Amino acid sequence: MRQAPGFTKTPLLGRLPRQISGGQRQRVAIGRAIVRSPRIFLFDEPLSNLDAQLRDEMRGEIKRLHRDIATTMIYVTHDQIEAMTLADRIVLMRDGLIEQEGAPLELFERPATTFVAGFLGSPKMTFLPGKLSRTAAGASIVLDGDGPRLDLPPGRIADRAAEGMSLILGVRPEHIYRADGMAGAPGEARLQAAIELLQPTGSRTYATFRIGGTPVTAELEAHDAGRPGETITLGINLNRVSLFDAATQRAI
């Protein structure tokens, strides 16, 4: 009890299992495992039956527990927020096979496949299909569906990638921003797009646009998000995008 104060509450001790909720049973089960002081923990979606607020609290408790007792924990989850916030290393699997293994930030910033890129992050990464174009000035990607040509920063794509190769450009909402009246920056692409939908969340607003026929989500400042139907100038930080081979769905 001393070791797991967040997982087993004193008012529950006198009750039978049938007298407590599913979420309370999960918390008691975690507490019972902790006080046994095992050499390794295996958690299989331990927070799945908890409501959102309690799930947030228990994530913090598990994080503190891991820090305090320094015991290896294997934590199975379908929740990418739990994976990112709790893990020292993530093993991301698909259909029983490992897609990528590494530190959370490594998987988030350098995803090995489109599956990894789309699984981590909320709102999820947008995928824009296009073709590689090479000129004496450098490489660019021409987006499908009458989309724009985006000039890639030097060294951003491998030399082995051939002219006309089908690519997928992955861009996260936080790397798209409103650029009206702003000076251009190295590695930045600019384009005009009309706001289709706004989803305010407080300090930030998620705006939906279409680029080359594909819906794209941008994370904008709430006070400067605009209004639906308004056409604004978007900036895309091409230094932070991911590029994938369309045929293999793997990063290049």
Task: Give the predicted meaning of each segment.
Residues 136-138, 198-203:
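Short, conserved beta-turn/loop elements at beta-strand boundaries and strand-helix junctions
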Residues 81, 105, 114, 126, ...:
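Glycine-centered loop/turn positions within well-structured domains
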Residues 95, 129, 241:
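Conserved coupling/switch loops of ABC nucleotide-binding domains, chiefly the family-specific signature
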Residues 139-140, 144-196, 215, 224-252:
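Glycine/charge-rich catalytic "coupling/switch" loops of P-loop NTPases
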Residues 126-134, 189-196:
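Structural detector for short beta-strands of small beta-barrel domains
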Residues 110-132, 170, 237:
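C-terminal boundary and immediately downstream tail of ABC-type ATPase nucleotide-binding domains
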Residues 1-115, 119:
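ABC ATPase nucleotide-binding domains
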